[in-house]
């Protein structure tokens, strides 16, 4: 049996896998434990690459367990904020591994953490899973920031209760809006190292000015929300832009970078079922 967690976001999917104990024992120490693969949804072959990734894992499992590759079974949990991408992926997985696969979407009802908001079923499952995974790993109270397409800043009480939070546009969404809403401003590539560096002073060209403005807006919003939520809390930052945001925050925020909390939460969920 292979446990698979798939975090379907708006710009990428993260696939985390955990093989059986016997398979783990047969692997080199450096490759043991959960394996994570991130695939961009902009890649037209993203579904194919996801299936190929699982097939490669099946070959390793089959070799360790002396069985046919086709008989390797998968237990899959999907957390999605993007149904338009998640549904065709699940259909393709069922077709590729129909003999031995179980796929289930994760909902707020799967989260053991109490959810103290007006409409729990409307909260993004990524926010809930990230908050629960952070609570399992760090001292509460917690402020959990997920820096992706959007940036969410959520509060978990000392008792481990999800209290809600704030949502704002992410780095790429902000710069895309600047480029789309003006004639002269370019679209930035936040994946490049240069874009991810926080300028040390006023921007001396257009790109530097955009970088400074967007990074300062997100980092400044997080700092402001820390004050609004009040009290001392552990700050945990996850998501694709976690590293960039942590670098932009002042040292006194003492932010902890955990880039793959949602994927880790999916494995936690399966292990505790």
From Swiss-Prot:
Needed co-factor(s): NH4(+); K(+)
EC number assigned by the record: 2.7.1.33
Enzyme class label: transferase
SUPFAM superfamilies per record: Actin-like ATPase domain
Note describing how the cofactor binds: A monovalent cation. Ammonium or potassium.
Catalytic activity: (R)-pantothenate + ATP = (R)-4'-phosphopantothenate + ADP + H(+)
Function according to Swiss-Prot or TrEMBL: Catalyzes the phosphorylation of pantothenate (Pan), the first step in CoA biosynthesis.
Protein name per the record: Type III pantothenate kinase
Single Gene Ontology MF annotation: metal ion binding
Quaternary data: Homodimer.
Keywords noted in UniProt: ATP-binding, Coenzyme A biosynthesis, Cytoplasm, Kinase, Metal-binding, Nucleotide-binding, Potassium, Transferase
Localisation per UniProt entry: Cytoplasm
Gene Ontology terms describing biological process: coenzyme A biosynthetic process
Natural source organism: Rhodopirellula baltica (strain DSM 10527 / NCIMB 13988 / SH1)
Annotated Pfam families: Pan_kinase
Gene Ontology CC entries for this record: cytoplasm
Residues noted as binding K(+) in the record, renumbered to the chain: 146
Pathway: Cofactor biosynthesis; coenzyme A biosynthesis; CoA from (R)-pantothenate: step 1/5
Catalytic residues (positions): 126
Residues at which ATP binds: 7-14, 149
TM segment ranges: none
Residues the entry annotates as binding substrate: 119, 124-127, 206
Organism superkingdom: Bacteria
Similarity comment: family membership: Belongs to the type III pantothenate kinase family.
